[in-house]
Structure formats: C-alpha cells, structure tokens
Amino acid sequence: MSMFNTISREFQYGNEQVVIETGRIARQANSVLVHMGGVSVLVAVVVKSDAKEGQNFFPLTVNYQEKMYAAGKIPGAYGKREGRPTEFETLTSRLIDRPIRPLFPEGYVNEIQITATVISSDKKHYADIAAMIGASAALSISDAPFNGPIGGARVGFINGEYVLNPSIEELKSSDLDLVVAGTKSAVLMVESEAAELSEDQMLGAVLYGHEQQQIVIDNIAELAKAVGTQKQDFVAPELNAELKEKVTTQFGEQVAEAYAISDKQARYEKLDEIKAAAIDALAGDPESEEFAEKEAQIKEIYNDLKYRTVRDAILSGKPRIDGRDLDTVRALDIQVGVLPYTHGSALFTRGETQALVTTTLGNSRDVNLIDSLAGTIQDHFMLHYNFPHYSVGETGREGVPKRREIGHGRLARRGVQAMLPDSDRFPYVIRVVSEITESNGSSSMASVCGASLALMDAGVPLKAPVAGIAMGLVKEGDRFAVLSDILGDEDHLGDMDFKVAGTKDGITALQMDIKIEGITSDIMEKALEQAHAGRIHILNAMNEVLPASRTEINAHAPNYAVIEINSDKIRDVIGKGGATIRQLTEDTGAVIDIDDNGTIRIFGENKAATKEAIRQIEAITAEVEVGKVYKGTVARVVDFGAFVTVLPGTDGLVHISQIADERVESVSDYLSEGQQINVLVQDVDNRGRIKLTMKGVEQEQTQA
C-alpha cells in the first residue's frame, strides 16, 4: 500500500500533454506538480489561517525559480549555487501574481506565499505557463478564498496563423509572443511583444488564448473538486454605515473640489488636509481607547470616498482630474541631444510625467551574458528603468532595482525591440537607461517614447519611431468610460489599465491588467482604437522634433568598421599564442573580433584608432607582388643568404647569389640583422616561399 494519496488530472493542451498531480511531493503545503510537455514545475502554496494584527494590505508573495539541475547544468555563479533571481525569474513571478491577485476578496489580508520551482526542463519550452497553471491549481486546492481557477496560454503568430504555446525555437520566427491569463468568463492579464501587428490581430490573439485555456480551467476545477478542501469562511468587514454617512456628508463636497486641482502635489496636500480634518472631527478624543480603531475606519472610508468621487465624475461625463476630456493626451515637451557627452539622449515630458533617457553604444565585449536553462544567452540590447523616490516627491532608500522597475523596464524594451536593426547591419551592443525624473502615471510609456528618441539621436537606424500610451477604464453596470493617457490616481481607481506601444503601422507591445469581470471584447476593441489615436498623436509630436534616426553615429560613440581577409591569413593576424592581435589591441586601443570566415569587426575609440587598426591588419595580411620592390628589414643572416621581412609576418630569402653583381664570399660582409634594404620579389613558389633579389635595385629607392 502506497504512503501517498495521489490525485491527478491529465489532458491534451495544444501540442502538449499536461499532467497536474497533488499528494506526492511537498505534502505539508498545498502543492501540485505540473508536467507540461518537457517541463516539470513544483508549485507550493502556504496560506496563513489568521491575519496579522493591524494588517491593512494583502501580503501575497509569488516566487518563481529555475533550478539549473532541471536542465542538467551546474550554475556558473560563485559557490556554484543559484544566486539572486534572474530578470526572467522576476518577470515570471510578476506574470503569475498579476492575474491571481484580483481574485481574492476585498479586505482579505491573510499572508499567502506561492513558490514555483522548475525542477525539470527539456530546454525547448519556457516554464512560465506551466508555473502559472500550477499556481492556479495549488490555490484552488487550498483553503484560501480564491475566486479562480485561472488558465494561462502563450500565443504566437506564425505565417498568419495563431499558434498555441509555441516552443522557444518557434518563437524565433513568430511575429508575436503573447501570454494571456483569465478565468472561465474573463480575461485578466495580457503581456506581449509583437512585430507591428494590428489592433484586430492583437485582440484576436487575446481571445484565441482565452478560448484555448478553458480546458486548463475545467481540469483544475475538477482537481479541486476531487481534493475537496473546505475554504476559509471570509466575509469582508463592512464599513461603519453611520460613520460612512458622516464622512460623505461633511467632506464629500470638499473631496470633489480637491479633485478639481490639476497640480498633483497641491491636490495631494489638499486631500491630506481633508483627511486630517475628518479624523479630528469624527474620531473622538486621541487619548481614548477607541481612537485608533475609529481613525483606521475613517481612513478606509475616506479612501472609498475618493474612489467613488473620481469614478462617479468620470462616468457622469465631467472633466477628468486635470480637466481633460476622456481621449485627450496631456501636454507634451520633447527634447533630444540634451546631454552632450552621452551617445544619445532625450528628455520626454508628458504632463507631470518625465523621463530622461540615454543610449550608450558598446562593442562586442559589452554583450550581456545570461545563464539560463536553455543555455547562455548573448543579449545585445538592454533597457534599464530607474524610478527614484524623488520622482514622486518622496524620500526613501535607494538600492537594487525592485520588481516593479524590472517589469517596467522589460515592457519598455518590448516596445522598441522589434524596431531595432539586425545585428549584422548594426553590430553595436546597445544599452538604454530611462531615469524617471517626474511621475504621475504612464512612466513606462514615457520610457518607450524617450527610448525611441534617444536611440535615433544616437544614430541607431530604427525601422520606425515608437510611442507608447497608458489607457484606463472605469465601468459601473452598463456604463463605462475609456481614458487616454491616465494619471496615477486614475490608474489606482480604475477597473482596467493597459499600455500600448507601437509605430504608425502597428503594435509592438501590449500589457493589460483587468480587475473586474464584464470587460467584453467590444470594450477592449474600443479601448484599443482610442489607444491607437493617442499613439499617433504622440508619434506626430515626436516626429516634429526628430522624424528619423540621425545618419551618422554620435561622435563620442565607438567607431566601427568591417573588413574581410583571406581565411588563410587569420593565423597571421592572431599570431603565435595571440601575440599579434594582442599587440594590435595595445597599439590602437581597438577591440578586434575575427570570425572563422575571415570577417574582422573593429571597434575603435574613434575614427583614427579604427583606421590605424585597419592599416596594420592590411599590412599583416597583404600578399607580396612579383616584380614589386619592397623596403624590408634583414631578419636573419645565414651562410647561404639572408631572410628579409618585406611585410609584417612575411619573410623572403635573398640568396647569396642575389646580393650583389660581384661574387659574395660572406653574407655578413654585406648584410647584418636589422639593416633596412630594398629588395625585388622575383618569384613566389607553390609552397609560398618568396625569392628576393638585391641585384639591379637602387638601395635609395623607396617602397613602391
């Protein structure tokens, strides 16, 4: 009799066979083991039965981790252990978190930790979809009040057809990499990058992925039913009705007036004043035992009042917080070339959101090497997003990038990546950094706009300029409003926010987060149409400042050149033990890369360095010409003649009979090592041996 009570579900999902099982591994947690094709992921969920005293937020943590043993590899880091999370692990943790978080009831604050561990991988598929399915299943069999399950799907677009859960190899030829997650009836999350697809094609991919994942949702529901865990009885605490009425009656009008203040900092100050006044008026004596509880209730009621005030104003057709219409983009100010010694720079300002973006061009040695389950990845493009506390007028401790910064940086990267030139055409390593210097919503899309401008300012030949816009949606019953270029407050108080980046011809990145059910395909279609109009408006403004990439690379960037040599000459350029190429690098300061086919790529600090490196390489690889006179240096004297260096690394023999017209008894009477002489190439035999002569050659003659 087995000691394990294993329950499992097995089903076909696209081209992959999926098995979800529980009861065999990690039995002290709510755990499932997901096998999906060649990938296995263990997902464990721990749910605290009680909330911490005074807890006022939902402490949900998702950790996705890839173990190198899963692919039969030993980590390359110090100590040969997995270190801090990679960017892909961090992004996947966020990918799982986003569709799950909205499915817990309002007011639920028990701590939940989800750990997804990749324990086996065929290196042919990403494990994020399997991990998302596992997280949904583990939560569904737990006692947490989770309003799931959810499903997850990756969608590609290859040869005009949608492809479900494409492999890593298939994604290389796909015009789309889209991940969609949702419940039985609603899409909750979309994350994607695309090669200028239309709004209809993107929406079609979302709906296709949601339709295909229904089999996942059904099987997880059956698994949860078979396990039969009793869910926690949770009822969200109701707001004190009497206190709510007082706060609304006494301070509702003041809150509405505060939201008519367009300046963010002034508005926040006024709202804080009103909150303090409400606490003073309604919380009672600060020394009383009931004060702390009443203060917390008033703060919660006040936040609800702000939420309802903004939403009601939008749905009733009133101007937005800053006075704009629903589809109006904030005022734009665009500058390029603002930092004289960077390779490319742009200052993009949209209302109270501002990004200072720089581009740096590097050589092949600057490539970012990433150790992954699929092998070592050479990343030639990096986009880093920084969000300092001062950008929102706050103080705080600066440190390593947080998950949000990594996620926003990846979204901005997705927006511009498809428009980068091929590495064969433009071999530079590119690093873009977006410093958010002011923020009031949509900073990731400001980074997309700034990145496009900074890249073009640096002379990177983009296929087309890219702009991004953040959209929001407020919905109550049948009434809804789509908002273009949302503020921070509109982001927090809305039911859906989505970000769209693209060119004039199509979408390059789409991110969508939906907090409620009832967002139909018609609503999403309208939102995408409105986003398209906003994107074109921003692109037109950008094009007025810099319509295309500069025709030349910035003067401060490394100078680049390519030359071709005969593959037989590669060893001459490299030299014994690499001595020649090391000397070349030391002499010129250039970085020199040589391919097996004889292609040499040279990155010099400036044009002069590149030119000198080319000159020296051409001298090393030059072929001697029969009948041509060369100025050479005597390398070695022997009894039968002298070996003379006529080109770098190329020696020929002056036979004793070819030194002078008269008979020569001793070579050393005429020649010595280091002596410079003029010689004529008589012949080169089929073994490459060079015959030289001094006869009839004027020794004052210079090299031809």
Swiss-Prot record:
Write the Enzyme Commission number(s) for this entry.
2.7.7.8
Keyword terms, alphabetized: Cytoplasm, Magnesium, Metal-binding, Nucleotidyltransferase, RNA-binding, Transferase
What does UniProt give as the signal peptide span? none
Coarse class of the primary localization is: cytoplasm
Question: According to its UniProt record, which cofactors does this protein need?
Answer: Mg(2+)
* Enzyme class per UniProt: transferase
Subunit structure of this entry?
Component of the RNA degradosome, which is a multiprotein complex involved in RNA processing and mRNA degradation.
The processes (GO biological process) annotated in the record are: mRNA catabolic process; RNA processing
Q: Where is the KH domain?
A: 558-617
Keyword Magnesium in record: yes
Record-linked Pfam families: KH_1, PNPase, RNase_PH, RNase_PH_C, S1
Q: Which residues form the S1 motif domain?
A: 627-695
Annotated function: Involved in mRNA degradation. Catalyzes the phosphorolysis of single-stranded polyribonucleotides processively in the 3'- to 5'-direction.
- Domain of life, source organism: Bacteria
Q: Which InterPro entries match?
A: ExoRNase_PH_dom1 (IPR001247), ExoRNase_PH_dom2 (IPR015847), ExoRNase_PH_dom2_sf (IPR036345), KH_dom (IPR004087), KH_dom_type_1 (IPR004088), KH_dom_type_1_sf (IPR036612), NA-bd_OB-fold (IPR012340), PNPase (IPR012162)
Q: What is this protein called?
A: Polyribonucleotide nucleotidyltransferase
* Annotated Gene Ontology cellular component terms: cytosol
Compartment(s) where it occurs, according to its Swiss-Prot or TrEMBL record: Cytoplasm
